[in-house]
Amino acid sequence: MKNIRNIAVIAHVDHGKTTLVDGLLSQSGTFSEREKVDERVMDSNDLERERGITILSKNTAIYYKDTKINIIDTPGHADFGGEVERVLKMVDGVLLLVDAQEGVMPQTKFVVKKALSFGICPIVVVNKIDKPAAEPDRVVDEVFDLFVAMGASDKQLDFPVVYAAARDGYAMKSLDDEKKNLEPLFETILEHVPSPSGSVDEPLQMQIFTLDYDNYVGKIGIARVFNGSVKKNESVLLMKSDGSKENGRITKLIGFLGLARTEIENAYAGDIVAIAGFNAMDVGDSVVDPANPMPLDPMHLEEPTMSVYFAVNDSPLAGLEGKHVTANKLKDRLLKEMQTNIAMKCEEMGEGKFKVSGRGELQITILAENLRREGFEFSISRPEVIIKEENGVKCEPFEHLVIDTPQDFSGAIIERLGKRKAEMKAMNPMSDGYTRLEFEIPARGLIGYRSEFLTDTKGEGVMNHSFLEFRPFSGSVESRKNGALISMENGEATAFSLFNIQERGTLFINPQTKVYVGMVIGEHSRDNDLDVNPIKSKHLTNMRASGSDDAIKLTPPRTMVLERALEWIEEDEILEVTPLNLRIRKKILDPNMRKRAKK
């Protein structure tokens, strides 16, 4: 017991927490000399590596001077907030990682607030101090002010600070120390993080905080033993959060060391282990001693704030590019996702249509991107916010939005957001001619704003947002200004007709792209939809051309990635997703039927 420390790593996206965990792993001697350590070893999913973000909370364990340190890497995005809260219940200490230049970001605030409310005393790690524009002292002051604003206790305000450059593998307790290795950080963890409370002699109590799935073993629950001890093959009682009970045996008990998972025989109070043996396990369930059952408090997960409809692809080009195209395949895959992804919900809404709710656009687009890579073909509707009724009042989710932008663009941003029902809360000048703007805005107002924002700030602005609360409905929000250019023919697009269409707006397609009636091929420069023919070819004459009418110059099309396309579409459009293409189309393909439906 004395020789265990359980800590979580909290940081904003891209402040280097996964890199720091790499450094701790390699310097603690957990990897033997022979093992080659990948970079960002904790981000195991392809998308996580590509985007450099952590989506699922991971755990690993290292040994340092006979002490076992269990480290849980938490996601930094508020969209994955469901993951974060559960992790905080499992640990006794937190490393709060802050970028020495950027300071505290809004998504970190979300987690810090939770950690402080659980009474955890954080260790502040100021990372990336090797950046030329680093201002570690200012950042420490910012953290202090943030803690005060969030009502931290005196003990929490007296936090230890470690300065580090995780990439280069060194840490120091004061800025004048020698840059050697991460030892000062290990020492700080041992000194300031309490060892787990709880006793080996009490009856067994353990709580599951995240799920995993293994094709061979079935459902695996990763849990912390709060009291007592547990053996492999022991009979235990599973107490679910709704009060029901189930008897069973622990068929597998798995411990963590470095990145490896090894089967173990026993686990004691304070350990973090994985167990198998129950198919009905859920997050927040307790595993207790059948002779003396004492369940732990179930966990409260944040409610989803946004939903989209996933449906079977029914366009004219359906089934040509994907491996899995049927409703049953899609249903099985979505339900499998729900087994391990707790912050999301999925309901069947009739034949081949599923409503998936989550904590934000990012979470939903990550799911769609994963499905797409696995060879699924499907369509997605525009994201909608979830509206709740509280005491007879319609309420919608509001977000806290923080924008860092060059000063020249702040006027345009404030005007844009005003139309989207945002309320400005603060405006502070930062260094290098940047301004930080803070708003409270309905989540609906943020859908589709990111691409406008990048245009307004010429790509130099940074925006981050996190969930605030549900508030009374705020009326209608301005949506996309421009109409769509819609194909009125089936076939392959030709350069000749695209050349004539491009004066009308911005194209999304290249020549030789397959198109069908009702497919959106571009954005109109005006606010109405326009039906166009993209497959017309030039009539040949037996006159000799003068050369001037031969030169067809096409502007490169705007490439639509998943997030951008989901933000762009309106209520009457859907996004068709296949492993090879993304196509935007109207829900009603036939132009005459569409006109009738509008009336």
UniProtKB/Swiss-Prot annotation:
GTP binds at D14, H15, G16, K17, T18, T19, N127, K128, I129, D130. It is found in: Cytoplasm. Its EC number is 3.6.5.-. One of its GO terms (biological process) is ribosomal large subunit assembly. The keyword tRNA-binding applies. GO terms for cellular component: cytosol; ribonucleoprotein complex. Transmembrane segments: none annotated. This is Large ribosomal subunit assembly factor BipA. CDD domains: BipA_III, BipA_TypA_C, BipA_TypA_II, TypA_BipA. One of its GO terms (molecular function) is GTPase activity. It comes from Helicobacter pylori (strain ATCC 700392 / 26695). Keywords: Cytoplasm, GTP-binding, Hydrolase, Nucleotide-binding, Ribosome biogenesis, RNA-binding, rRNA-binding, tRNA-binding. Belongs to the TRAFAC class translation factor GTPase superfamily. Classic translation factor GTPase family. BipA subfamily. It comes from the Bacteria. Monomer. It catalyses: GTP + H2O = GDP + phosphate + H(+). Its main location: cytoplasm. Residues 2-197 form the tr-type G domain. A 50S ribosomal subunit assembly protein with GTPase activity, required for 50S subunit assembly at low temperatures, may also play a role in translation. Binds GTP and analogs. Binds the 70S ribosome between the 30S and 50S subunits, in a similar position as ribosome-bound EF-G; it contacts a number of ribosomal proteins, both rRNAs and the A-site tRNA. The keyword Cytoplasm applies. SUPFAM superfamilies: EF-G C-terminal domain-like, P-loop containing nucleoside triphosphate hydrolases, Translation proteins.
